[in-house]
Amino acid sequence: RKQLNDFLRDTGLFFPIDPGADASIGGMAATRASGTNAVRYGTMRENVLSLTVVTADGRIVQTARRARKSAAGYDLTRLFVGSEGTLGIITEIRLKVYGIPESITSAVCQFEDLESAVSTSILIVQTGIPVARMELLDDVQMGACISYSKLEGYEEKPTIFFEFHGTETGAKEQAETVQAIAEEFGGSAFQWTSKMEDRNKLWQARHDAYYAA
């Protein structure tokens, strides 16, 4: 995944699926991986266009052609994505990629209780705000991340990490709208930044949550 995005960077494109543990593209397809940005970009299920698979008897199967609209036959791509190698070995993958956003903003908001954080998340999704990433950590997990990743300025409280993609104005408006919703449920210490260094540190802490625990 990281190698793919390094290759795509100069083309202005990126592959958005970002699971908690780094993995190969083949492994991500085999396990139908998702990640923090599934709220906007979906999971591997929605982002694999076709596969080449070798079955147990040696047959080579191409699960789909280039035509985007086809109602002929079984949806073999969806069948193999998530099959964990039980139906065949994936040898080639055709993926959907996206344009790198003009602006990326990350934000953090903390809550007094888990119910308020969950209610905030639900309302944000129901409102239709195109949040790129949204990850909820309870107080125990947040405490572990603070200790392990040396996150400064945060308390051991239920916390939501956000990321917004779009134009500079659009990302800012999304962040402000989410902040207003969070404050309705008692959200506090809402902080947002567009600096790459700060964004990377925040999401790296999320990736390291397993080790932090």
Positions of PLM-derived features:
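Noncatalytic alpha-helical scaffold of FAD-dependent oxidoreductases
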Residues: 1-213
